[in-house]
């Protein structure tokens, strides 16, 4: 498995993959421009860690976007989105990608990963496999 940083030089490729995945597999209505803007916002953020996952034949299998956030005595990685492309889901690619992210953010000084995910059994099972649990000290406000 190969992990390539998503940078301003490869956003076009990533935006196309992102748009196609959500439009084909999730009934999305993404345009290339909106996908490009979303990925670029994360990539250009200070202390971002955004990766493209590719198999050994250089075929993209997924991506992760997020950033490190620092406080006076604590740094965490906010995992904004992890995406495994449709045909690669439920084959261990997500586990490998999150393991890679864990290693890289620890090397950069993060003590933990924080995220918001859908409240369903699939996501709870996936993240629970990494020792993550629902935060009891936070409430989502809208």
Predicted segment positions?
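A short helix-loop-beta-strand connector motif used in the catalytic cores of GNAT acetyltransferases and
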Residues: 40-52
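Conserved acetyl-CoA-binding loop-helix of GNAT-fold acetyltransferases
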Residues: 84, 90-103, 129
């Amino acid at each position: 498995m190969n992990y390539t940083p998503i940078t301003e030089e490869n956003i076009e490729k990533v935006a196309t993959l992102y748009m196609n995945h959500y439009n084909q597999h999730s009934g999305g209505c993404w345009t290339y421009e909106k996908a490009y803007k979303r990925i670029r916002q994360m990539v250009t953020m200070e202390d971002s860690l955004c990766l493209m996952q590719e198999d050994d034949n250089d075929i993209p299998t997924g991506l992760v976007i997020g950033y490190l956030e620092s406080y006076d005595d604590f740094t965490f990685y906010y995992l904004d989105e992890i995406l495994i492309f449709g045909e690669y889901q439920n084959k261990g690619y997500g586990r490998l990608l999150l393991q890679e992210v864990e290693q890289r953010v620890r090397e950069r000084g993060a003590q933990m990963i924080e995220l918001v995910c859908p409240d369903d059994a699939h996501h709870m099972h996936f993240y629970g496999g990494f020792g993550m649990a629902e935060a009891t000290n936070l409430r989502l406000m809208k």
